[in-house]
Amino acid sequence: MILRKKCISILLLTVLTASLCACGNTSKSISDSKDNKSSYSSTYNQNNEALKFDTAKWNYDETNNVYWTIGVQYCSDPESTDYETMAIYVPGEYMTGTKNSDGTYTCEINKSGEVNGYTSETAPIILPIDTPGYSAQAAPTSYNYDSAASYLKAGYVYVVAGMRGRSSLQGTSEDQGFSGGAPWGVTDLKAAVRYYRLNESLLPGDTDRFFSYGMSGGGAQSALMGATGDSELYYPYLESIGSAMTDADGNVISDAIAGSMDWCPVTSLDYANEAYEWNMGQYFTTDTRDSSSFKSALSKDMAASFAEYVNKLGLKSEDGTELTLSESEAGVYNNGTYYDYILNEIQTSLNNFLSDTTFPYTYTQGKIQIGNTASSGGGEGIDLSRNPGQGGNKDGQMPPQGQSGGRGQGAGMMQGGAQSSESKTYETAQDYIDSLNSDGTWIAYDSQTNTAKITSIEDFVKHCKEATKPVGAFDSVDLSRGENNLFGNGQSTALHFDSVESSLLSKNESNYSKYSDWDSSYITSFEDDLKSEDSVGTDMQTRVNMYNPMYYLSSYYSGYNTSKVAKYWRIRTGINQTDTALTVETNLKLALKNYDGVESVDFATVWGKPHTTAERTGNSTDNFISWVDECLK
């Protein structure tokens, strides 16, 4: 496979290295970043002519009063025009258009128009991210009003930016190969935001009011957009595709956003393996966790490593209690304030369900297929597969198994697809609780207060959140996980990235080698991959950091306070999902609530819901719009 490599200036990399060594809080508001000269210095020559928006290429949907345009190239040197263009959808009230001879329109901003209390100067700008399994989001090639209608009616500007996905793919001819994987997807989104800000005098919407949303891998990248604003780690990647870096006056252009909506974010991949084993894997002895496999021992060691990590994170609860784990007689580190906090999150989720639900209640069991997100909560959910970008591959679906090739098989990280559904109706809350307790009491229910208490995390997991992924849930020894593709680098389309797992394999070889399925080559495979660099010359650990929101939000990491973090956050997860540990979204919430400059964190886990756009009540589209309005009005 031939991949285009672009030269990155030595000066930029020198400045970048120096800046990363600096200490102190560099966080500023988004508006501040637009009004001040930047110390950004580089030999990069920005192609301003190529980055200027053409106001004469609008189209008009007279029926719905929408101005729209597609194929807007947001960088001057794209790796792939299949992905690195965007569509812009604007309520007609915000523009004044003059029809051209070819049927298109030349438009100017109309400052007097108003929709839902917003104007062309105050309207939020929405960025949908439909990237299940960190797959690509193809750029829109046609107009689709229905997918944007709710947002346009709310007075929002809707921007669908194509973005590369987790794999290094080959184009239709040999010279069209391009780099994918981390951090190229988020790089593309940042370039789209920067392009819009460069052209803000020509485009409607308040560029201080970018809000992203996504589910699963899209939720993860939405979280990254919220956490990595203006991170200098992305500069060489942005330059390599010809992104807008400075405006006409030499001011640095920000890629920070105002708000991030994240459903079931599969993120924090540096400790995702270990979190999965602590939260779920340690309680099971089937499949790869069978006692005959070395992975049963690895599972326990991973769980213990997660506890060590938690004890260094410095997480605090809402009342200021330091959250830590301690050893326990049963299980791996099933003690401490952190354990109690996670147990309380589970209990709160159940009690919210009891409070929200009117009985008789019908429960439908069955997992939603990723890429075709169905209803959540009490109504219809956001169907991310119907976004104008079409998500996933160009057909809007997950990449087929094995697409990426290489040493791994390219299996999707969230596969399983739709399962047959079974429905059951419960007449009362007591009937529902009795059903959950059918094989032993693990929930105590008080009908007078309509509240419940749960005995342990283990009981909850065994009944509602089974470990369906193998040991090495995100980085397996055979390189078969989707995340292994995410950290491929062009030369190898699947690579190991978990340094903790690598250390455990090396440190505990004498124990693991007692098992018949042990292979000493696992150690060298991990060690070699962790030394690899991508086409920009970035090492594996840095790439992992760039795709970890906690790297920017927690003082445990050197990236703390090196980015402009979004002010507004909303996180929802189906607590029954088996795709990732409950600790992932919980740690993200805790870090955000303790981060200076974050104004609000709206968080909930949704009882009985799987890996989907889960909501306690209502539907995800309306709830998202209501939340954005609450943040801004």
What positions do the PLM features span?
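Disordered, low-complexity segments in secreted/periplasmic proteins that are enriched in proline
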Residues: K28-I30, K34-S38, I368-E427, F487-G488
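Cap/lid segment of the alpha/beta-hydrolase catalytic domain
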Residues: P128-V186, T228, G608-T613, N619
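Alpha/beta-hydrolase active-site loop
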Residues: F178-L202, S620-S626
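C-terminal motif of bacterial Sec signal peptides marking the signal peptidase cleavage site
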Residues: S19-A22
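Primarily recognizes the serine-hydrolase "nucleophile elbow" in alpha/beta-hydrolase
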Residues: L198-Y283, K367, A374-P388, G392, ...
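Histidine-bearing beta->alpha loop at or near hydrolase active sites
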Residues: G574-Q577, S600-D622
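Catalytic-loop region of hydrolases
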Residues: I30-T122
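Short, surface-exposed "cap/lid" segments of acyl-processing enzymes
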Residues: E93-S150, R570, Q577-N587
